[in-house]
UniProtKB/Swiss-Prot annotation:
This is Porphobilinogen deaminase. The gene is hemC. Tetrapolymerization of the monopyrrole PBG into the hydroxymethylbilane pre-uroporphyrinogen in several discrete steps. Its EC number is 2.5.1.61. Belongs to the HMBS family. It comes from Pseudomonas syringae pv. tomato (strain ATCC BAA-871 / DC3000). Gene3D superfamilies: Periplasmic binding protein-like II, Porphobilinogen deaminase, C-terminal domain.
Length: 313
């Protein structure tokens, strides 16, 4: 095995560093003697913590700086949370590995109440996600949704300080950082459909680096990849990013894949649902099919309004 070095571009947040260390350990396990180093950096999304993601606008808030490092040969691979990865890549870069998915569900976290249903009317719930907000308010219009940004530790500290009655976070991030005991209850995907790619880690690199592609191959998890391909295809067809109220979740059923999609008005007054099944080999086309079903119900009008609000800020 080559003794060449692989440099991993990563954000500096605790969760991003966990993901990078996970990939580092997997690479070292698969290729003894391989030197793997981290290249930590700060993304635009990490700097702009005083505004909701939906108000900042733009795509690639958490990946652009990492992609620049790849393009300028300051790193060999970049490790991302798949839900943060834009649908399109800069010329010369691509997604060449998707690791096995962690729990994709949203997590209800509270120090006082056992579940979303147990929250009294008027309770304050923290989330930075319009996707979560739309589904929460559709189920519980009596709740107050309050803006919540920052890393996992910061969000938990705000809950502990009494700023919120409960907060909603990705279960995967809590599990990976050792905070599984803070999950009061996992929210069923039937009640809160996840973001596309939620819980999965992806690895981006230069398209021409065949040696890097070969080194990444043992880390690739095909079942997860099929699911994420279907979800990302839906997102792409709806021109979605990580800051819009689009949800999608795919599961494998034998040789088929079942994809559910949702577009919601942030007020929770309108939730559009669609789903379909197709052979796993048609995962990408399935995403387009479900997206088209959502568009036929009026999804474009909801998303146009959301993008308009972001652009007017």
């Amino acid at each position: 095995m080559s003794s060449r070095e692989i440099r991993i571009a990563t954000r500096k947040s605790a969760l991003a560093l966990w993901q990078a260390e996970y990939v580092k350990a997997r690479l070292e396990q698969a290729h003894p003697g391989l030197l793997v180093t981290l290249v930590p950096m700060v993304s635009r999304g990490d700097k702009l913590l005083d505004s909701p993601l939906s108000k900042i606008g733009g795509k690639g808030l958490f990946v652009k700086e990492l992609e620049t490092a790849l393009l300028e040969d300051n790193a060999d691979i970049a490790v991302h949370s798949m839900k943060d990865v834009p649908m399109d890549f800069p010329q010369g870069l691509g997604l060449f590995c998707i690791c096995e998915r962690e729990d994709p569900r949203d997590a209800f976290v509270s120090n006082t109440f056992e579940s979303l249903d147990a929250l009294p009317a008027g309770s304050i719930v923290g989330t930075s996600s319009l996707r979560r907000q739309a589904q929460l308010l559709a189920r519980r219009p009596d709740l107050q949704i309050r803006f919540l940004r920052g890393n996992v530790n910061t969000r938990l500290a705000k809950l502990d300080a009494g700023e919120y009655n409960a907060i909603i976070l990705a279960a995967a991030g809590l599990i990976r950082l050792g905070f599984e005991d803070r999950i009061t209850s996992a929210i069923s995907v039937d009640d809160s459909l996840p973001a596309g790619g939620q819980g999965a880690v992806g690895i981006e690199c230069r398209s021409v680096d065949a040696e890097i592609h070969a080194l990444l191959a043992p880390l690739h998890h095909e079942d997860t990849a099929v699911r994420v391909i279907a979800e990302r295809s839906l997102n792409k067809h709806l021109n979605g990013g990580c800051q819009v109220p689009i949800a999608c979740y795919a599961v494998l059923e034998g040789d088929d894949v079942w994809l559910r999609g949702l577009v919601g008005d942030p007020s929770g007054r309108v939730l559009l649902h669609a789903d379909a099944r197709a052979p796993q080999t048609s995962a990408q086309a399935l995403g387009v099919q479900v997206a088209e079903a959502l568009l036929a119900q009026g999804a474009a009008e909801i998303l146009k309004a959301v993008y308009g609000e972001a652009n007017n800020e």
